[in-house]
């Protein structure tokens, strides 16, 4: 029998062939030969993930053991699973994998050698192994030789849970076991589950080392200045950080340590619904041989791609290594950020397109994490809905929100970063009536903030939200900056703004131990 690479130590015995860290071309060949996908006209591997075209947050669990019981914030996001249930589920999963070919990726999460974690991902499908090969940090030959994983993901979409036996909610499951340093995934082919489960692990482990883990993108200017972009799925993190005038560090997950910031990943996972070469040339050009397209419409004859088609899902995705973006920062490490941007997709159409935040307002809005759940990023979401996701990443935060807010607040104060709130959502009315914010205008506002061009501009407090709105911005018409001016019916705007202010206040009641100066930094409710 060939090298099993220590899989028997996990409890995986009698596998078929084992393929470890295959090069991209071989993984693409094998995925095609196994009927897992097709080659699109631009060379990317195009796959479909079945009925699960987004994350399935209701199907994610954490094993409740004494070592983590008091440090995990249990609830609807972090659902507990008994240890015995995990072991029984894992035994059946291991039995299912006997005799099947397995694909192993050994690599790292974390670009900074001081904080990176060696990981292993074991896949049933070649295309998913290509995905993790492109998304995580790839090892050198010497690093691979010495690799000893500290956390393992086993992903077998073909294996399904039995809810009444396993204690799950459906046939799909994502279970994190911190004691076993093991994640098991089954019943869903959506590759984002692997990425986000490892992100959750980092969000649990890094605060103990004084590192602030963040759901954000990051880039670097010509002078080495760095900027962060926080926001939930679909708010513009990937799009706005892929700026031809700046160098991309990473598009989704970073840590902020005493030394600066670092990317957790080695790749990008971009939404590509309505992708255009005109508006997002860097992402457009990154989708080529070696990239993976998830649930994107591809003509069966010509293999031409239709990025506008949402027949399978709004949540169409492209995965590619960060070095497919020209001039990306490799390794993904930068200095302390000078600018922090909170992105929100406001479905009510009443938030300003850009506003400056005081330190207290920054903490209020970070804890609130207001945005809209955009169609397709989770199962069951077909129209935008107002939502509050603490720290712009509640689905991935195992600990209390205060842990992450305190870490970020300390970093912002210590390094004097300017914080802006940017609305990439609707203007001139709520979703369905108003229009989506112009991407060129948003880019112009973000560039002005990062370059310091708003520092000398007059700011006026928003009468409802209290945040500081600039009266002018290079490249943006003045009337766009004041959301009330974009509505035909000003009374309807006022009513909608009051409604959203009330939702902010209602949501913030759950933070009982927050200092009064932060609580007072929220919208004025009349």
From Swiss-Prot:
Enzyme class (EC, first level): lyase
Role noted for this protein: Involved in the gluconeogenesis. Catalyzes the conversion of oxaloacetate (OAA) to phosphoenolpyruvate (PEP) through direct phosphoryl transfer between the nucleoside triphosphate and OAA.
Protein name: Phosphoenolpyruvate carboxykinase (ATP) 2
Residues bound to ATP: 196, 215, 231-239, 280, 317, 442
GO cellular component, one term: cytosol
Family statement: Belongs to the phosphoenolpyruvate carboxykinase (ATP) family.
Species for this entry: Moorella thermoacetica (strain ATCC 39073 / JCM 9320)
Binding site for Mn(2+): 196, 215, 252
Superkingdom as given in the UniProt entry: Bacteria
A single GO molecular function term of this UniProt record: metal ion binding
Alphabetized Pfam families for the sequence: PEPCK_ATP
GO biological process: gluconeogenesis
Intracellular or extracellular location(s): Cytoplasm
Pathway: Carbohydrate biosynthesis; gluconeogenesis
Recorded catalytic activity of this chain's protein: oxaloacetate + ATP = phosphoenolpyruvate + ADP + CO2
Cofactor binding comment, as recorded: Binds 1 Mn(2+) ion per subunit.
Main location: cytoplasm
Cofactor(s) the record lists: Mn(2+)
EC id: 4.1.1.49
Residue sites binding substrate per the record: 55, 190, 196, 317
This protein's UniProt keywords: ATP-binding, Cytoplasm, Decarboxylase, Gluconeogenesis, Lyase, Manganese, Metal-binding, Nucleotide-binding
